[in-house]
């Protein structure tokens, strides 16, 4: 038996990165005290979701991985607590900017995953800020198991989850920043959850999604060309079992630490017994890569 205890942290985010990191630290320690060894924070939790507006000065938020304040802080936390912490950041690599997760394990930096699928509409203007990732779908060999990571919009694509599972992931994590959909005029929360529950079921793999909460408003100014915008992030973070069943679930408004334990050996055996990886026919799937 290989026991994995995972936590998904749901939190509101401040305009002040120091405040956000301090809050995230307290929630991570709450997860540690509940026995978690793999702890997921939301996407870009250092500050409010700046992608609501287009501002050239916000490019300055991006830093090289090891110069990022959240990475530096949580590298120490991971060493002190013996935990695995995927940290979502705005990365600068040379003159290229990415939406990135840095994987930290017990004081060690294991590498990065860069967001593959970049969304764009009036309220989620990520193409203005991020270049599509060039890392491929990464599975990290950590002290608690093989961990696959997708970032927010990646979670809507079944190819992400299948690629991670084929590459040996034993759990999939999705740091997220999602909420109201003013352009679509819909409440996407149920759709959002069911999408990842389906990925979990189809791959016989647990999934954890950590979302932010709260309403974040954009103030019109010259720097953003007088844009008006507001998003209410709907939380609803969750953890599924290997069949896609919700085993832990947060509400829409509360700061929450969800914790659940799995037997990875049991899950891996079940995946083999189902034969889903065995019975794949990659030679027949050309239509989806046109």
Question: Across the structure, where does each feature detected by a protein language model lie?
Answer:
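N-terminal active-site segment of His-dependent metallophosphoesterases
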Residues: 1-38, 173
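Short, glycine-anchored, charge-dense loop/turn motifs used at functional sites
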Residues: 6, 103-110, 240-247
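Cys-nucleophile CN-hydrolase/nitrilase-fold catalytic domain and related Cys-dependent amidase chemistry
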Residues: 17, 26-112, 178-205
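Short glycine/proline- and charge-enriched loop/turn segments
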Residues: 53-61, 121, 222-227
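Active-site catalytic loop in hydrolytic enzyme cores
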Residues: 63-66, 76, 92-198, 273-274
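CN hydrolase (nitrilase-like) catalytic-core segments centered on the catalytic cysteine
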Residues: 66-84, 152-256
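Short beta-strand scaffold segments in enzyme catalytic cores
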Residues: 87-89, 100-103, 138, 237-239, ...
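A conserved C-terminal secondary-structure "cap"
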Residues: 265-290
């Amino acid at each position: 038996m290989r026991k994995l205890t995972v936590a998904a942290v749901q939190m509101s985010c401040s305009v002040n990165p120091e405040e956000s990191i301090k809050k995230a630290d307290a929630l991570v320690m709450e997860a540690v005290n509940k026995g978690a060894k793999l702890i997921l924070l939301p996407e870009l939790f250092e500050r409010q979701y700046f992608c609501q507006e287009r501002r050239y000065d916000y490019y300055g938020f991006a830093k090289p991985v090891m110069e990022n304040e959240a990475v530096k802080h949580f590298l120490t936390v991971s060493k002190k607590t013996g935990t695995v912490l995927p940290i979502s950041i705005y990365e600068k690599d040379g003159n290229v900017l990415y939406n990135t997760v840095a994987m930290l394990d017990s004081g060690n930096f294991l590498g990065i995953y860069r967001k593959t699928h970049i969304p764009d509409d009036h309220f989620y203007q990520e193409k203005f800020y991020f270049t599509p990732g060039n890392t491929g779908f990464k599975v990290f060999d950590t002290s608690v198991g093989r961990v696959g990571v997708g970032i927010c919009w990646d979670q809507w694509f079944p190819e992400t989850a299948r690629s991670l599972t084929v590459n040996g992931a034993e759990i999939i994590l999705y740091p997220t920043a999602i909420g109201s959909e003013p352009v679509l005029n819909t409440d996407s929360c149920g759709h959002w959850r069911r999408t990842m529950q389906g990925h979990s079921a189809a791959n016989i793999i647990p999934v954890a999604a950590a979302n932010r909460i709260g309403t974040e408003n954009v103030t019109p100014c010259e720097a953003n060309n007088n844009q008006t915008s507001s998003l209410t992030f709907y939380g609803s973070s969750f953890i599924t079992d290997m069949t896609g069943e919700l085993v832990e679930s947060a509400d829409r408004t509360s700061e929450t630490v969800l914790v659940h334990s799995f037997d990875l050996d049991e899950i891996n055996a079940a995946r083999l017994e189902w034969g889903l990886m065995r019975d794949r026919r990659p030679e027949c799937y050309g239509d989806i890569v046109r």
